């Protein structure tokens, strides 16, 4: 763990003033900021500098000078964003306040990626100070998640645009200088390239406005490419317009928009609409006169079907190009000068070191199944094989295998929504109406009204207030926003009705009847279904705003509520694309690992019924969920806000809590955890590593999922399935089963990374189960990984392993789900601590938590795991079911998403090769059966040659020999042997016992 260097005593006393002097000098001399702004920034700096000087700081840099620079940037960014939001843009006239985030970073010699990586630590520490200075809604006004998402999207889109431009156009007008796919990225890109990007940025500012989702922005970029193809002089073209294999013909001419729609997987209707917006933008901003392309004669339009196209004379002529670029540059500068946001021109600047080369999520940015750092503008050679390279078109449009990218994957998923869901009727089908009308009373009208209100809350329209606030924007901006919101509401509504009908059919078969009154009259169930549908629509379009958990806040449900429907939703929508299934499963993982355990979760309401012994602790900590806001309350907020974003979270927290004791349910853990996976949860899809948890859903659970009607029934109601359980007990049993499955995956990953024995794996797993069952309160307000990490260290101590907490944390950092906040900020209630020297709630590092909270509670359970641990110490204060708690189950077999058999005719599997499988699979007698990517199968060979050999064997017409060959290097492996070898064998959960020690912080 890299932590801040300790400050010297002189720095802590007499050096404090010099710290403020350096900050003031940085503001005034380094950035030429105005006096009023410097005064406000100095106020925040002085209020927070004790945190900078604290020995407990955890910003991941080494030198004190580096720490200061980060802190300077964080303070200035926060003040810039929050003071402007508070003042309502009243400081626009003060030139000393007109600066962007990029200017601050350049002054501090930092890059964007490192800024986003360390910002959560600043927010965690300075959050209370920001709340005191700027109000409780400071985090939403700061918009860090949105800014980070925007950066990720633009990183992808800029690579997408650069690749497409280099395929379509030359760097110069000389045809001999055509760039190849392997040419150097240092090639100078002409003004046409910059013009296109600036036009795209102008489109984002003036037309897309609030809803800058990835799909809409991709349509915008493709529209810009169309403008360039029409107007860039023919001598710069790198394509032949007569190439029938690349372009769609309409008669004897090329249909340009249809061609681009096919190549880049866009909707041709959306492309036409966006083209109209671009044309209007050029007319208004560049003062160019539009002409019907069909009435204009120019070499650029030869062999193009000009129907519906617009042409601007002199738009790309060299005499006018510089002026147009300058106009767009000024327009963009004016638009961002006082917003403190990113200067999005950095993505096409020649000097792009400001972008950085780090990563943004748990050590790596997870994009479409690969971990990839943000590169500077990658060379064509790199992007050809990169999974981040844009859709390879037009040259590869007809290729059998085109590598998927985040952008192309998003467009493919959007096509599913457009072709499968959009054509459906925006009302209940006849079959669904039959179920709705078969209840004790007809609930059709209720279902329709609820859907309208909830989806309006999730996808609000722009109100008159926003129309006025959009000064300087085109008049069509608000109209575009409203059209976007209406389209998304319609898609979510149709998906909701479709899945609801399928679920009703399945439930009726379970219950042997059409009367589903208990389910179809359950308000919470319907809101969960609507939230799930809306989240899929948002995930498909990859929005910058309304990131998860926005759907929870706007529908009034909790994480525990949503976790009940995700599995059923996936199961009952068979057409759901694989990437959306992954998205829902990644959400479920996020819900289970921490969000369900946070204050205000409805899980605690069920847990208090299922485990009465925990009720007092749950009430003491104020963990119970508040009543769900009524539909009328949500509708009122929609109407009062005139379509602006309704402040439902405050309604949920305050209006329905007259005693005022619950207050803000957000914990520092939640604040920071939301930044760790902006890319994973929304801006890209989860990796196959996460699919290990999805695969666990196939493991037979001890507690089968209950029927939906019982999952959403009152916690105290008897389970209609029998067994003498209440619905709360059934729900908690199912929930605990999911937690144990998720823990099994993560424990196994750490075991493999630490190269520990299967016996240790079994012991850690047994301990985790015991803690969940008998020390459930240790999970309250915490992340399950915190319990897992402490369990590893506790088991290491009783097993006399030479394993330090530092080694555990270092290896945890390499896990795909790692969040630094897990070990940097653990909730503690000092009233329950071993050394009760402080009072109240606090957040400490994981070693302090282990010593003060974990070991005093778990030590008896650790002793029980040892052969001789059944005499000295017994557990006499179980949280759960008492001494009669069921014996922990052995470690389950964890199927990988692989092995994947390539085809029925080839005896070839593809599977991740873990260290635990290596010895079993790669023996001397069977080595030729396996090809390890990155490790040659023969001497002096390369991985690329290995892959060529594999492909040739799979694709070639190999003649089978008539005689059997018993040579070592020949033969086949049976399917059963391969399948069985890929499952880890169960071990023994017993291990020798040693004295349970506490961990000392390591220097």
UniProtKB/Swiss-Prot annotation:
Keyword line: Cell cycle, Nucleus, Repressor, Transcription, Transcription regulation
GO molecular function, one term: RNA polymerase II transcription regulatory region sequence-specific DNA binding
Tissue and organ expression note: Expressed in roots, stems, leaves and flowers.
Transcription keyword on record: yes
Gene Ontology cellular component annotations, sorted alphabetically: chromatin; nucleus; transcription regulator complex
Region (Disordered): 868-899
Domain of life: Eukaryota
Gene3D superfamilies xrefs: 1.10.472.140, Cyclin-like
Main location: nucleus
Region (Spacer): 608-729
Family matches, as InterPro entries: Cyclin-like_dom, Cyclin-like_sf, RB_A, RB_B, RB_fam, RB_N
Pfam family, one: RB_B
Gene Ontology biological process: cell differentiation; negative regulation of cell division; negative regulation of G1/S transition of mitotic cell cycle; regulation of DNA endoreduplication; regulation of transcription by RNA polymerase II
Region: Domain A, residue numbers: 405-607
Region feature (Domain B): 730-860
Stretches the record annotates as Pocket: 405-860
UniProt-annotated location(s): Nucleus
Family: Belongs to the retinoblastoma protein (RB) family.
Function comment: Regulator of biological processes that recruits a histone deacetylase to control gene transcription. Formation of stable complexes with geminiviridae replication-associated proteins may create a cellular environment which favors viral DNA replication. May play a role in the entry into mitosis, negatively regulating the cell proliferation during leaf, stem, and flower development. Critical regulator of the endocycle.
Miscellaneous: Plants undergoing virus-induced gene silencing (VIGS) exhibit clusters of undifferentiated cells around mature stomata, indicating uncontrolled cell division from meristemoids, as well as increased ploidy level in some cells.
The protein, known as: Retinoblastoma-related protein 1
Organism: Nicotiana benthamiana
Lineage: Eukaryota, Viridiplantae, Streptophyta, Embryophyta, Tracheophyta
Originating gene: RBR1
């Amino acid at each position: 763990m890299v932590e801040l260097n300790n400050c010297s005593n002189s720095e802590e006393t007499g050096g404090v003033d010099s710290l403020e002097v350096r900050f003031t000098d940085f503001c005034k001399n380094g950035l030429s900021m105005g006096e009023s702004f410097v005064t406000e920034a100095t106020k925040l700096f002085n209020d927070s500098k004790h945190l900078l000087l604290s020995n407990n700081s955890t910003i991941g840099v080494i030198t004190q000078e580096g720490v200061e620079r980060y802190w300077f940037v964080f303070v200035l960014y926060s003040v810039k964003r929050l003071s402007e939001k508070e003042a309502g843009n009243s400081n626009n006239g003060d030139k000393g306040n007109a600066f962007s985030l990029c200017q601050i970073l350049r002054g501090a010699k930092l890059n964007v990626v490192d800024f986003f990586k360390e910002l959560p630590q600043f927010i965690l520490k300075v959050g209370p100070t920001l709340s005191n200075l700027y109000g409780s809604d400071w985090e939403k006004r700061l918009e860090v998640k949105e800014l980070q998402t925007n950066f990720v999207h633009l990183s992808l889109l800029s690579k997408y645009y650069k690749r497409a431009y280099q395929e379509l156009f030359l760097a110069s007008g000389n045809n001999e200088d055509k760039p190849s796919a392997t040419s150097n990225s240092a090639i100078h890109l002409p003004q046409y390239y910059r013009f296109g990007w600036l036009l795209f940025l102008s489109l984002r500012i003036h037309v897309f406005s609030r809803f800058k989702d990835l799909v809409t922005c991709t349509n915008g970029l493709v529209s810009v490419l169309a403008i360039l193809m029409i107007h860039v002089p023919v001598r710069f073209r790198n394509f032949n317009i007569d190439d029938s294999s690349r372009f769609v013909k309409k008669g004897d001419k090329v249909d340009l928009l249809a061609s681009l729609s096919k190549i880049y997987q866009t909707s041709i209707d959306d492309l036409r609409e966006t083209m109209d917006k671009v044309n209007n933008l050029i007319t208004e901003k560049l003062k160019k006169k539009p002409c019907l392309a069909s009435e204009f004669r120019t070499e650029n339009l030869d062999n193009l079907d000009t129907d519906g196209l617009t042409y601007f004379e002199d738009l790309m002529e060299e005499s006018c190009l510089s002026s147009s670029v300058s106009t767009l540059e000024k327009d963009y500068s004016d638009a961002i000068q006082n917003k403190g946001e990113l200067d999005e021109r950095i993505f096409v600047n020649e000097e792009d070191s400001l972008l950085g080369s780090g990563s943004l999520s748990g050590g790596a940015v997870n994009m479409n199944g690969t971990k990839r750092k943000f590169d500077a503008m990658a060379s064509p050679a790199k992007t050809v094989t990169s999974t981040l390279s844009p859709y390879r078109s037009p040259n590869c449009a007809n290729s059998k295998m085109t590598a998927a990218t985040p952008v192309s994957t998003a467009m493919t998923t959007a096509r599913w929504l457009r072709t499968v869901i959009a054509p459906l009727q925006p009302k209940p089908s006849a079959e669904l109406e039959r179920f709705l009308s078969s209840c004790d009373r007809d609930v059709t009208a209720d279902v329709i009204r609820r859907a309208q209100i909830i989806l309006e809350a999730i996808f609000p329209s722009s109100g008159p207030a926003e129309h006025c606030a959009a000064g300087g924007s085109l008049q069509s901006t608000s109209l575009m926003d409203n059209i976007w919101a209406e389209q998304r509401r319609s898609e979510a509504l149709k998906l909701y009705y479709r899945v609801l009908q399928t679920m009703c059919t399945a439930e009726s078969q379970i219950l042997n009847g059409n009367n589903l009154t208990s389910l179809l009259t359950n308000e919470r169930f319907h809101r969960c279904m609507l939230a799930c549908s809306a989240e899929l629509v948002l995930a498909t379009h990859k929005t910058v705003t309304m990131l998860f958990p926005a759907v929870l806040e706007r529908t009034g449900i909790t994480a525990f509520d949503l976790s009940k429907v995700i599995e059923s939703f996936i199961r009952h929508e068979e057409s759901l694309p694989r990437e959306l299934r992954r998205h829902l499963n990644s959400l479920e993982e996020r819900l289970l690992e921490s969000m369900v355990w946070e204050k205000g979760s409805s899980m605690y309401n069920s847990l208090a019924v299922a485990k009465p012994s925990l009720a007092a602790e749950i009430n003491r900590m104020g963990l119970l969920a508040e009543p769900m806001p009524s539909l009328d309350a949500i509708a009122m907020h929609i109407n009062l806000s005139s379509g602006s974003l309704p402040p439902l979270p405050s309604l949920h927290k305050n209006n329905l809590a007259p005693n005022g004791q619950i207050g803000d349910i957000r914990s520092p853990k939640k604040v920071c955890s939301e930044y760790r996976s902006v890319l994973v949860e929304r801006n890209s899809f989860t990796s196959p590593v996460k699919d290990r948890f999805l695969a666990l859903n196939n493991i037979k659970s001890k507690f089968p999922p209950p029927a939906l009607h019982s999952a959403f029934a009152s916690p105290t109601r008897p389970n209609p399935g029998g067994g003498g359980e209440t619905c709360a007990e059934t729900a908690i049993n199912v929930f605990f089963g999911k937690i144990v499955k998720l823990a099994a995956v993560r424990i196994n990953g750490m075991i493999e990374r630490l190269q520990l024995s299967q016996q240790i794996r079994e012991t850690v797993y047994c301990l985790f189960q015991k803690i969940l069952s008998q020390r459930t309160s240790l999970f309250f307000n915490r992340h399950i990984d915190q319990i897992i990490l402490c369990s590893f260290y506790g088991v290491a101590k009783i097993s006399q392993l030479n394993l330090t907490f530092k080694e555990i944390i270092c290896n945890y950092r390499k896990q795909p789900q790692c969040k630094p906040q897990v070990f940097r900020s653990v909730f503690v209630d000092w009233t329950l601590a071993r050394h009760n020297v402080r009072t109240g709630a606090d957040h400490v590092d994981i070693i302090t938590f282990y010593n003060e909270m974990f070991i005093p509670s778990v030590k008896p359970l650790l002793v029980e795991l040892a052969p001789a641990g059944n005499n000295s110490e017994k557990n006499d204060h179980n949280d759960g079911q008492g001494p009669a708690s069921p014996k922990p189950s052995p470690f389950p077999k964890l199927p990988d998403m692989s092995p994947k058999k390539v085809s029925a005719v080839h005896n070839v599997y593809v599977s991740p090769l873990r260290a635990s499988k290596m010895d079993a699979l790669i023996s001397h007698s069977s080595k030729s059966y396996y090809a390890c990517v990155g490790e040659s199968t023969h001497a002096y060979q390369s991985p690329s040659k290995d892959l060529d050999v594999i492909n040739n064997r799979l694709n070639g017409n190999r003649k089978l020999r008539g005689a059997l060959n018993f040579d070592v290097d020949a033969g086949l492996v049976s399917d059963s042997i391969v399948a069985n070898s890929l499952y880890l064998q169960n071990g023994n959960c017993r291990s020798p016992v040693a004295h349970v020690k506490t961990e000392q912080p390591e220097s």
